[in-house]
Regions:
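Structural recognition of alpha->loop->beta junctions
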Residues: 96-99, 200-227, 290-295
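Short beta-strand/loop segments at the ligand-binding rim of alpha/beta enzyme cores
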Residues: 181-190
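Conserved N-terminal subdomain of the carbohydrate kinase-like
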Residues: 39-54, 69-158, 360-370
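Glycine/threonine-rich flexible loop motifs
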Residues: 159-168, 197, 227-228, 235-236
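Active-site beta-loop-alpha junctions enriched in small/polar residues
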Residues: 157, 190-194, 222, 269, ...
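Charged helix-capping and loop-helix junction motifs
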Residues: 166-173, 199-206
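Glycine-rich phosphate/adenosyl-contacting loop at the front of the ribokinase-like
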Residues: 3-79, 84-98, 300, 305-307
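Conserved phosphate-binding/catalytic region of the ribokinase-like
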Residues: 9-22, 176-177, 209, 228-370
């Protein structure tokens, strides 16, 4: 029976199409590292700076394009305005494959989401973010594009204001629609901003309602602590991953499994990745291989030279999705997630370092069942 399931899921992977929907924006990154922080407070001055880097941002670009680079068949679903920034987003995506823009919707009513990333001399990055079209992305934008797909991944519900309206009912309806078509569902998060709409949601109440319709949920340590362990997050901040041990991860992922997911996990940055799975019947219900049922593991990160961590969590999710869809062992799934994240952080942007699935497997010595 195990062999039958394994072969069945392997065949499904070869024919699969993954939809990545949600947050999509353009990052504008001016080179201002030569300007001291104090000079930013001096109004009316002309400061000579370096060139601006233009990069795609958000889960749709980061996870979606990582999946594309790994060789998966992927559809990107987002919303852009009919404006110059929207044109830039479309052009940047089309450089990878013109077909990838087929499900990017355009609108005349909302300006395209963007962020300006500023890193003054000797300081950490600051983000100036315009929600725009990301906040306006609606359920119908996604459900229109589900035909023929086998997996739906939604990136960053805290930023998807329209989907989170009315106690996240549009988001929940979208997930239900996907599962009713026998699609596997997953979501990725961001840390809620206490000064923005995402910081006003009652996550301890809403998350169980959402996760009842999610099959795979692997947030970062900071994200899940901010949502379900706010006291710990207040103490640890973005260094949560350094404080989480086996017992903490086991208990927290146990809560996520009780909320309904089939595969729960925590992305732990330089400390690796923890995964825990539900029982056999739940995995079959999620269209996932039952051979990984009732397991848990902690996979250490791979030692690489880090140039930038932008998109590392998104890249990790891409590796996890590919491994799960190919019915690999839980060890292989976790290793592939960590390996794709390792490739990501070796470059300054989110996608440039991602290699093909074969190249990634060979480089990191990851076992693969054909």
């Amino acid at each position: 029976m195990t062999i039958h399931h394994h072969g069945m899921y392997q065949k499904a992977f070869a024919m699969s199409r993954i939809i990545v929907a949600g947050h999509l924006c353009l990052d504008l990154i001016p080179a201002v590292h030569m300007i001291p922080l104090a000079d930013f407070a001096n109004a009316g001055q002309l400061h000579e700076v370096g060139p601006v880097t233009i990069a795609l941002g958000g889960a749709v670009a980061n996870t979606g394009l990582a999946l594309h680079m790994l060789g998966a068949e992927v559809g990107l679903v987002g919303l852009c305005g009919n404006d110059v920034i929207g044109d830039l987003v479309m052009d940047q995506i089309a450089q990878y494959d013109e077909r990838l823009v087929d499900c990017i919707h355009r609108t005349n009513h909302v300006a395209t989401s963007y962020s300006i990333v500023v890193t003054p001399g000797g300081q950490d990055r600051s983000f100036f973010y315009f929600p725009g079209t990301t906040a306006a992305l609606a359920a119908h934008h996604i459900t229109l594009c589900l035909h023929g797909a086998t997996w739906l991944h939604i990136g960053y519900p805290p930023l998807l204001k329209a989907l989170m309206a009315h106690d996240a009912q549009p988001l929940i309806a979208t997930l239900i629609a996907a599962q009713s078509c026998t699609m596997t569902t997953s979501i990725d998060m961001v840390v809620p901003d206490p000064n923005a709409t995402s910081g006003t949601y009652d996550w301890p109440r809403l998350l169980p309602m959402i996760l009842a319709h999610v099959d795979v949920f692997v947030p970062s340590a900071a994200e899940i602590c901010a949502m379900l362990r706010p006291a710990d997050y207040a103490r640890w901040g973005h260094a949560c991953d350094a404080h989480i041990d086996d017992t903490y991860a086991h208990q927290l992922c146990g809560e996520l499994l009780e909320m309904g997911v089939a595969v729960a996990g925590i992305k732990l940055g330089a400390h690796g990745l923890y995964l825990r799975t539900a029982h056999t019947q739940r995995l079959i219900q999620a269209q996932l291989s039952p051979t990984i049922a009732d397991q848990q593991m902690w996979c250490p990160s791979y030692p690489v030279t880090v140039k930038g961590t932008v998109g590392a969590g998104d890249a990790c999710y891409a590796g996890l999705i590919v491994g799960l869809m190919a019915a690999q062992s839980l060890t292989t799934v976790a290793q592939l997630g960590c390996a794709v994240a390792a490739c990501c952080v070796e470059e300054i942007d989110a996608v440039r370092g991602i290699q093909s699935l074969d190249a990634t497997r060979r480089r990191f010595g990851i076992d693969w069942r054909e």
